[in-house]
């Protein structure tokens, strides 16, 4: 009987943590969606981008959502690959300072454009607009996370 008493406490605490995780994730995705909706409206207003894919709600979510997810994957993969190179070659001048950030930015922008963006024919954004958007993302990353370190590594 004692086993079931402790088991219920574990189940309740797990459900509480899971509920908080799901709610915070949903709020994050909602804010991300509103932010990207606002970005798309700004691009349309200034005639910098055109979004012509207009089916039902689920198809739009899958089409535009996959564009965002694949783009995030490219940014994430390049960032980790460049960090790996920087750790393997610490004395290389190409992987230190602002030149490292410039190489990361250029590689990410070119790979995003030629791997992801070209295949989405209903999203019409010029290369220079994508370059400015990704450049702003890198600038914000440098401002808000200047020298972030992995807190999980215990030395």
Swiss-Prot record:
Chief place of localization: membrane
- Which gene name does the record give? sepA
Q: How does it sit in the membrane?
A: Multi-pass membrane protein
Task: Give TM segment ranges.
Answer: 17-37, 61-81, 103-123, 125-145
Disulfide pairs here are none
Pfam annotation, one family: SepA
Task: Quote the cellular component terms of the Gene Ontology held in the record.
Answer: plasma membrane
Please name the InterPro entries in this protein's record: SepA
**Keywords noted in UniProt:** Cell membrane, Membrane, Transmembrane, Transmembrane helix, Transport
Report the sequence similarity comment from the record: Belongs to the multidrug resistance efflux pump SepA family.
Query: In its UniProt entry, what is this protein called?
Result: Multidrug resistance efflux pump SepA
List localization entries: Cell membrane
């Amino acid at each position: 009987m004692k086993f079931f008493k402790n088991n219920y406490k574990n189940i309740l605490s797990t459900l509480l943590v899971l509920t908080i995780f799901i709610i915070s994730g949903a709020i994050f995705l909602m804010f991300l969606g509103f932010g990207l909706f606002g970005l798309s409206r700004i691009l349309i207003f200034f005639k910098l981008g055109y979004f012509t894919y207009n089916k039902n709600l689920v198809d739009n979510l899958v089409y535009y959502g996959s564009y965002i997810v694949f783009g995030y994957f490219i940014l994430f993969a390049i960032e980790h690959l460049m960090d790996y190179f920087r750790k393997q070659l610490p004395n290389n001048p190409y992987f230190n300072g602002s030149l490292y950030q410039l190489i990361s930015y250029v590689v990410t922008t070119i790979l995003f454009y030629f791997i992801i963006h070209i295949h989405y024919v209903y999203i019409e954004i010029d290369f220079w607009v994508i370059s400015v958007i990704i450049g702003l993302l890198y600038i914000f990353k440098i401002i808000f996370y200047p020298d972030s370190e992995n807190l999980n590594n215990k030395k």
